[in-house]
Amino acid sequence: MHLTCEKRLLHKRKEKKMVRIIIGTTPIIHYAFHIVDPADFTAAFLTIKDAEGTEVLRKGLDDAVIGEDSIEWKLSQAETLGLTPGGKYSMMLNWVLEDGTRGASYADLLLCDDNHIREVIV
């Protein structure tokens, strides 16, 4: 049975916890923090890699919008369209706090055939 992209994603949602649903060719990748204060970041990098582990996109703290308890990056349409339609990518967030504490978060990115990023799964 062939599931449409939307149905596949609904099925996946039942299996794993969602970080954020992002729709469109200029998606916003959003991370919310409950313990760490993003204002204390001295460095933060968002890295997207393809299935083979090749880095295809990297954004730094200068590209981020830092909220009270969150950090987010907006991908440009060109960046999103540069990803392979229907492809699977991994996304890693690494950060360093003023006191030297380090942290990381890993997630899978799923692209639908029309190059819209529909969801981030952790």
Feature-to-residue mapping (PLM):
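Contiguous segments within soluble domain cores/interaction surfaces
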Residues: H2-V122
